Amino acid sequence: MNNLIKYSTFLISDLFDVVIGKTIDGNKAQRNENGTPYITRKATRNGFEFMIDGEKEKLYSGKLPVITIGNETSKPFVQEFHFFTGTKVNICIPKLDLNRNHLLYITTMIENATKMFSYSYTINSTRLKSLKILLPIKGEEPDWDYMNTYISKILSNMEKNFDVQQNDGVSDLRSLKDLSWSQFKMDEIFSINSGVRLTKADMKPGNIPFIGATDSNNGITEFTSSTNASFDGNVLGVNYNGSVVENFYHPYKAVFSDDVKRLKLKNYPNNKHVLLFMKVVILQQKVKYAYGYKFNATRMKEQIILLPTKADGTPDYEFMEQYMMRMENKVVGRTTEKEAD
């Protein structure tokens, strides 16, 4: 928090109209990959569950962007597209014309203010309306320019490390069922390196992502200027502690907690698409591990994973890359179509 900026508290009800979703059972709805997002109270993936075809009268089709907050999880997310959601999700509709950056700033303030809530004491719409959050001010009003600039700088620093999104060329159109699959130890596929312990007391504020053992925010738990031997990029960060087996791809340079292992491919150039394929493969092992049964380096090296293979029995990295390019192209195409509407 900037010590030169003045702050004041505001009620959520001063800033937002709070409504709840409609009665809808997403599990019974018709799933359609070209449908509309179904947002739930989950604390990950921006609340996104899957795409569905739902009844139009139950669609949130109002002002955008908005913030959604699940009752039990109290996790706020910014939604920029219209969506379906149920009665356990609160929709915060800005009373002013606020942009994504404003709402991203506010979600952080909401998270700071909702730590007292839990599954036994949920943040329903009544409690949410009376929730107080701390915001920077200019005079007596929220300093929207400061919030917008602050988030813009953070996003700009991160986006410098990403390639410009484009529709990748794909030549391999095989499906997963068309392939041969074989078992491999993770140690055959990856170099596995540890993170380094960095305590809050030793952590200095900055713009370098700090990767912790969380299941959300792409693993980012803080931003720091402190670096150590774990400073790395273009890797998979795999949690061996905390939210065990959860893993995220980090194209940007980051500092990694000692609860997170850094994985790089041994026999193929590290790239976003192959590592994202591996992310899903590794997540299939999550059911085996828990807080009392850590996914430590020894177990990680011996863990068996199933991968598509070539005729010679080696992993088909080229297919993995092409397959994830296809998935990415679908998302890029869908997003472009919605932005054009």
From Swiss-Prot:
<keyword id="KW-0378">Hydrolase</keyword>
<keyword id="KW-0460">Magnesium</keyword>
<keyword id="KW-0680">Restriction system</keyword>
<keyword id="KW-0238">DNA-binding</keyword>
<comment type="similarity">
    <text>Belongs to the type-I restriction system S methylase family.</text>
</comment>
<dbReference type="InterPro" id="IPR044946">
    <property type="entry name" value="Restrct_endonuc_typeI_TRD_sf"/>
</dbReference>
<dbReference type="GO" id="GO:0009307">
    <property type="term" value="P:DNA restriction-modification system"/>
</dbReference>
<keyword id="KW-0255">Endonuclease</keyword>
<dbReference type="GO" id="GO:0004519">
    <property type="term" value="F:endonuclease activity"/>
</dbReference>
<comment type="subunit">
    <text>Heterotrimer of two A and one B subunit. Both subunits are necessary for DNA-binding, which is sequence non-specific.</text>
</comment>
<keyword id="KW-0540">Nuclease</keyword>
<protein>
    <recommendedName>
        <fullName>Type II restriction enzyme BgcI specificity subunit S.BcgI</fullName>
        <ecNumber>3.1.21.4</ecNumber>
    </recommendedName>
</protein>
<dbReference type="InterPro" id="IPR000055">
    <property type="entry name" value="Restrct_endonuc_typeI_TRD"/>
</dbReference>
<comment type="function">
    <text>The specificity subunit. A B, G, H and S subtype restriction enzyme that recognizes the double-stranded sequence 5'-CGAN(6)TGC-3' and cleaves bilaterally and symmetrically 10 base pairs upstream and 12 base pairs downstream of the sequence to release a 34-base pair fragment. Methylation of the recognition sequence occurs on the adenine in either one or both strands; seems to methylate restricted DNA. This subunit degrades DNA in a non-specific manner.</text>
</comment>
<dbReference type="GO" id="GO:0003677">
    <property type="term" value="F:DNA binding"/>
</dbReference>
<dbReference type="Pfam" id="PF01420">
    <property type="entry name" value="Methylase_S"/>
</dbReference>
